[in-house]
Amino acid sequence: MAEKKPIVAITMGDPAGNGPEITVKALAHADVYDRVKPLVVGDASMIEKVLGIAGHPEMSVRRVESVAEATFEPGTIDVFHMDLIDPDKFEFGKVSAMCGMAAFKSVVKAIELAMAGEVDATCTNALNKEAMNLALEPEGRHFDGHTEIYATYTGTSSYAMMLAHHDLRVVHVSTHCALREACDRVKKDRVLEVIKLGNDACLRLGIEHPRVAVAGLNPHAGENGLFGTEEIEEIAPAIEAARAEGIDVEGPLPSDSLFSKALGGWYDIVVVMYHDQGHIPLKTVGFVYDREAQAWQAVEGVNVSLGLPIVRTSVDHGTGFDQAGKGTSNELSLLNAIDYAARLASDR
């Protein structure tokens, strides 16, 4: 019997950015349909608008009002259509409440489809946080990003962000907050929670005996308290508690040398304490900037939300407003995110 292909809901992201373009480019790869059944969620007019820009005017868009209507045929992009964009007010590369709300609503719809069991996984294109909150804050709402939206709409309290580039994986104790606040969030219970989430993610990816590394917060991992005490008071106790639960974990380790070992295959996942501690090493190996084209190329990283009752993966880059509408955006991160979603969905 042929293996069942998962249905993956792909949100369009902020339509003023690169999401619609890279979605078309990704789904132009016919082999994607060998692995998944892709369903785009958003305003179909935005996908139609970029077919030529993306270099694929031969492709077509099928608007559907239910998952059951989708046929998942290469060359035709199934879009769960939501009437979100006024074409007279739309402009590429501009922050707007209209596009921010469109991106937000497409994410919420994808979550609803996954929670209802109508799709097997979700995969998100980038949204612009300023645009989204420009739309939401007048209503008394605010979200820092995708992860917080997913946590709210799935009722999840224990979650974390994982970034992956091939065999390098990092999972964060904190992400979108000021660095001063990030230091305050380094607490034993949270560090232990993230160690466990990272270990579980590796198991779901088929790694039988995950090796987990934990970075220190301070220079030289605190140098035995000389440069800070968080390693002694919070991080080390969390590591000991994780070991007591049978997790193979090492640390706290100095982050300036840790990633060389991780890239060499010594560890399966690295727990980092704050946003840039994990994003910098992963994006250093996952991003390439083409100076001549003045554009990012070969963007291979993937963002995964851990701890949710549904699968959510994402591109590991922003909306690319400076490239929007020019046909120069790279779809590789989205292709990898779709594949990651399929891998995680197959384990559920």
PLM region descriptions:
Residues 144-157, 179-201:
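Active-site glycine-rich loop that binds ribose-phosphate moieties when present
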Residues 152-168, 305-319:
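Short, flexible loop segments at boundaries between secondary-structure elements
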